[in-house]
């Protein structure tokens, strides 16, 4: 079996039976191994869902730019989707973020802007404010806003075709 692209592998994570930790329970307990997603995180699943929903309703257009404030895992999921689908990515993070995570995002083509941590979220220098401003100012940009994005929540409340 093979997949037409890396995005088809997102969510197709294995179920593993837990044995010792649930030995006293009268049922089978299974765990999804989300680290087998291409970005090594459950966040790949919600990143792809947000991108697909934004494409479907016209918020994200061909050749567009994905803008988000992220500490890494959501950004990696968004970046993987972006590189496959042909979008540019600009991620805004804080100076607390590790160099390795910033470098990982850059390695998949994302531009990363680092903001100070020790400012109020409403401060114009905060990563929340900078990412929102960039989303508003850059032509053909889509500001993901993962914390308030309904697609993020909906992913976990309805059956997903990616749950196999």
Model-found features: residue ranges?
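PLP-dependent amino-acid enzyme catalytic core
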Residues: 1-158, 164
């Amino acid at each position: 079996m093979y997949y037409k692209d890396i995005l088809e592998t997102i969510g197709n994570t294995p179920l593993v039976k837990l044995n010792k930790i649930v030995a006293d329970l009268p049922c089978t307990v299974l765990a999804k191994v989300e680290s087998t997603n291409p970005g090594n995180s459950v966040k790949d699943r919600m990143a792809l869902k947000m991108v697909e929903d934004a494409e479907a309703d016209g918020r994200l257009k061909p050749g567009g730019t994905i803008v988000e404030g992220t500490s890494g895992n959501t950004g990696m999921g968004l970046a993987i989707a972006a590189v496959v689908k042909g979008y540019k990515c600009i991620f805004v993070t804080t100076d607390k973020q590790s160099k390795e995570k910033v470098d990982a995002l850059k390695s998949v083509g994302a531009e990363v802007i680092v903001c100070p941590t020790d400012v109020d979220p409403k401060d114009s220098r905060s990563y929340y404010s900078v990412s929102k401003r960039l989303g508003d100012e850059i032509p053909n940009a889509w500001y993901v806003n993962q914390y308030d994005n309904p697609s993020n929540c909906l992913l976990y409340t309805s059956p997903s075709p990616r749950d196999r």
